[in-house]
Amino acid sequence: SKASQQASEYIKLVGGAENVVDVTNCATRLRLTLKDDSIISKEEDFKAVGAHGLVHNGKAIQIIIGLSVPSVREEFENLL
């Protein structure tokens, strides 16, 4: 599915499953807490996969996805 493809790309872009501490979401964003935020890819890379943008605030990042975020989160968590 599109959601599973996006989830697998996002995991690579944030430095792999081992770099993800926590995952939540709001209405439109996948919110992640990372161990090391220095290894994540650039916002353009997230946009190339289909994200609308990236909010990077230290170890807390938000991938702006849109209303399909619950299905992307589900696939993302399955890959952790």
Q: What do the predicted segments below correspond to?
A:
Residues 2-80:
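Structured cytosolic domains appended to multi-pass membrane proteins
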